[in-house]
């Protein structure tokens, strides 16, 4: 099947300035992400950035760049600019791979594209089982609950679903009902065009989760369990050192 990968790579970061260019064992982080995307079999891979230094690093590695504005409020808005500049048809399958995921498995990039292509829906994503209480109660681990057909009912930083009887006895263990949302998305280009014209929803402001805008406006998001769980993403200096060690 044919699909396009777009990798948003914003230069500014509160915790890690210049994050896309941080060195991981001799290569900029964004180049590692580009290489994982190439392994997925994508027809085309575009790095969307707002900084010339990132563009130069990607082009030096043989990658394609689309320069975007620096004032986007989300990665999806940056994708929308690329969709318009490249003139993708509405039915083009686009996978959004985060620029700070140098250890993302290529197999799940393709998985989310295939899941979207097989369904009459505008958006798809992935999740992974949660087995430990620490992750289940961590607000930085976004939880998702699904309906019988694998479509998202809700995403939250809260512990959902709340296992009333189990948690009344102890908060030390969790069952097999929890799923952690993974930050990889597949979209049809036409859906991205519609999404950016919707006003932000109250729920996404409360949870700080932009995918809640989709549910707010009555659209569906298909969620599959990932074939392989991604390694550590890079949000902090500690994450960076961990990734450097794991990728040696």
From Swiss-Prot:
GO MF terms held by the record: 3-deoxy-manno-octulosonate cytidylyltransferase activity
The taxonomic lineage of its organism, from the top, reads: Bacteria, Pseudomonadati, Pseudomonadota, Gammaproteobacteria, Enterobacterales
Q: Could you tell me which CDD domains the record lists for this protein?
A: CMP-KDO-Synthetase (cd02517)
Name the UniProt record assigns to this protein:
3-deoxy-manno-octulosonate cytidylyltransferase
UniProt enzyme class: transferase
Q: Which Gene3D superfamilies has this protein been placed in? A: Spore Coat Polysaccharide Biosynthesis Protein SpsA, Chain A
- What is its biological role? Activates KDO (a required 8-carbon sugar) for incorporation into bacterial lipopolysaccharide in Gram-negative bacteria.
Q: Which gene encodes it?
A: kdsB
Q: Does the keyword Transferase apply?
A: yes
Family of the protein in this entry = Belongs to the KdsB family.
Tell me where it mainly resides: cytoplasm
Which PANTHER family does this one have? Answer: 3-DEOXY-MANNO-OCTULOSONATE CYTIDYLYLTRANSFERASE, 3-DEOXY-MANNO-OCTULOSONATE CYTIDYLYLTRANSFERASE, MITOCHONDRIAL
Q: Which domain of life is it from?
A: Bacteria
What is the catalytic activity of this protein? Answer: 3-deoxy-alpha-D-manno-oct-2-ulosonate + CTP = CMP-3-deoxy-beta-D-manno-octulosonate + diphosphate
Pathway listed for it is: Nucleotide-sugar biosynthesis; CMP-3-deoxy-D-manno-octulosonate biosynthesis; CMP-3-deoxy-D-manno-octulosonate from 3-deoxy-D-manno-octulosonate and CTP: step 1/1; Bacterial outer membrane biogenesis; lipopolysaccharide biosynthesis
UniProt entry keywords in alphabetical sequence: Cytoplasm, Lipopolysaccharide biosynthesis, Nucleotidyltransferase, Transferase
Gene Ontology annotations for the cellular component aspect, listed alphabetically:
cytosol
């Amino acid at each position: 099947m044919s699909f396009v990968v777009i990798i948003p790579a914003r230069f500014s970061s509160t915790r890690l300035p210049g994050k896309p260019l941080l060195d991981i064992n001799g290569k900029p982080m964004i180049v590692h992400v580009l290489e994982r995307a190439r392994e997925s079999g994508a027809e085309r891979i575009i790095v969307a950035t707002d900084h010339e230094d990132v563009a130069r690093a990607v082009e030096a590695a043989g990658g394609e760049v689309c320069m975007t504005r620096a004032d986007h409020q989300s990665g999806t808005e940056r994708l929308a600019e690329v969709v318009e500049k490249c003139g993708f048809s509405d039915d083009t399958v686009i996978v959004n791979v985060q620029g700070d995921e140098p250890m993302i498995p290529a197999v799940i990039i393709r998985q989310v594209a295939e899941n979207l292509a097989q369904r009459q829906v505008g958006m798809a994503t992935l999740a992974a089982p949660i087995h430990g209480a620490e992750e289940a109660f961590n607000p930085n681990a976004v939880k998702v609950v699904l309906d019988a057909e694998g479509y998202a009912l809700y995403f939250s930083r809260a512990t959902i679903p709340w296992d009333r009887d189990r948690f009344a006895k102890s908060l030390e263990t969790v069952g097999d009902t929890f799923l952690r949302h993974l930050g990889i998305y597949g979209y049809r280009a036409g859906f991205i065009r519609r999404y950016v014209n919707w006003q932000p929803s109250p729920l996404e402001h409360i949870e700080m989760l932009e995918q809640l805008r989709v549910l707010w406006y009555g659209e569906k998001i298909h969620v599959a369990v990932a074939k392989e769980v991604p390694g550590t993403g890079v949000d902090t200096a500690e994450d960076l050192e961990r990734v450097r060690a794991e990728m040696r």
